């Protein structure tokens, strides 16, 4: 029982340490840089590299300016045509189930 309490305490401390950055506002984080140029070091010259790629990179440039949270949200909203194909491909399974149920009901 004592070991369980120690493990729970260690787990709670680790959880608190790892989640500390997620619940604090950016202004309270001590290690986080602040100011208008604070995030320049994350992706230095990235839009410049896209400009050199040519006109095919126009869509990539728009996605890069949008930011990754918006990109993930946009991608999660999209559904591809494969869902419709899968539903059409497995439609026969429903027919097989219904015909088996009808066969069980006959005397």
Curated annotation (Swiss-Prot):
Which segments are removed on maturation as propeptide? 22-61, 99-107
Question: Region annotation Disordered: residue ranges?
Answer: 26-65
GO function term, MF aspect, one? hormone activity
- Specify the species: Equus caballus
Provide the family line. Answer: Belongs to the gastrin/cholecystokinin family.
Query: What does its PTM field state?
Result: Neither gastrin is sulfated.
* The protein's role, per its UniProt record: Gastrin stimulates the stomach mucosa to produce and secrete hydrochloric acid and the pancreas to secrete its digestive enzymes. It also stimulates smooth muscle contraction and increases blood circulation and water secretion in the stomach and intestine.
Query: What keywords are assigned to this protein?
Result: Amidation, Cleavage on pair of basic residues, Hormone, Phosphoprotein, Pyrrolidone carboxylic acid, Secreted, Signal
> Which subcellular locations apply to this protein?
Secreted
Q: Which residues form a coiled coil?
A: none
Q: Which residues carry this modification: Pyrrolidone carboxylic acid?
A: 62, 79
Where does the record place the modification Phenylalanine amide? 95
Gene Ontology CC entries for this record = extracellular space
Q: Which residues carry this modification: Phosphoserine?
A: 99
Protein name in UniProt? Gastrin
Return any one Pfam family short name. Gastrin
- Main localization category: secreted
Instruction: Tell me the first and last residues of the signal peptide.
Output: 1-21
Single GO BP term: response to food
Entry annotated with the keyword Secreted: yes
């Amino acid at each position: 029982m004592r070991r369980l309490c120690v493990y729970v305490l260690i787990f709670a401390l680790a959880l608190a340490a790892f989640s500390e950055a997620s619940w604090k506002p950016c202004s309270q984080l001590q290690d986080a840089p602040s100011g208008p140029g604070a995030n320049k070091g994350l992706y230095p010259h990235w839009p410049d590299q896209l400009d050199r790629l040519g006109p095919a990179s126009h869509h990539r440039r728009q996605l890069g300016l949008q930011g990754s949270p918006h990109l993930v949200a946009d991608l999660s909203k999209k559904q591809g045509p494969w869902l419709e194909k899968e539903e059409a491909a497995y439609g026969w399974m429903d027919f097989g189930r219904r015909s088996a149920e009808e066969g069980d009901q006959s005397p």
